[in-house]
């Protein structure tokens, strides 16, 4: 395997760019190939089997580009497809749930941990199981936040509407007295200032995607597949199954890249199922 090959990142939409942003900062010599399945989001309400199917379609697309590692930059897809992808693919596959769970336990002082995520991730109990396996004494309070992803995907995440929706959604969770809150969806860091404002300064927010890049770095070193050139060999590539201009508008702002460009692609035929 050529060390100069890209790392593949995949998500249901633009949320995975929160992971990419950290990767660009932490691993500047690594080439990024990213695909966001905006045509079929949100993944949260979908059955796990369907999410697995979509995940394999994205993985196949990236594998055809000879990536050296796959990062499932989506909590719902990690919960539904990580074991199957690891079994089927010949390259390292990294999800976002285990790194986020470890970071939450490390940050929590009173072992009262909140998890906010999509319906699919909450339904899977993936975070609860990961946290309690490591520390059975922990208390885990989970809440699905189905309105958050649409706010981000419609580029409304800094709006007054977003502020109101976040406050209303987290009203009950705030009463649960958690000291640490896992942002269990890679879209949610774009709402981080609003979430922090509602939960208060005493609650530590855990960005599971950002924590995942630490795992990516460790695996690159362990397997000796990090790019050892002084610069990237190949340019980064970004793909969306949705509208490229909408994807670009969010990405340019979030990544701070005014010349950011994305390409539209089609995957499968189940966009409206």
Swiss-Prot record:
InterPro entries: Asp/Glu/hydantoin_racemase, Asp/Glu_race, Asp/Glu_racemase_AS_1, Asp/Glu_racemase_AS_2, Glu_race. GO terms for biological process: cell wall organization; peptidoglycan biosynthetic process; regulation of cell shape. The active site is at 74 (proton donor/acceptor), 185 (proton donor/acceptor). Transmembrane segments: none annotated. GO terms for molecular function: glutamate racemase activity. Provides the (R)-glutamate required for cell wall biosynthesis. This is Glutamate racemase. It comes from Lactiplantibacillus plantarum (strain ATCC BAA-793 / NCIMB 8826 / WCFS1).
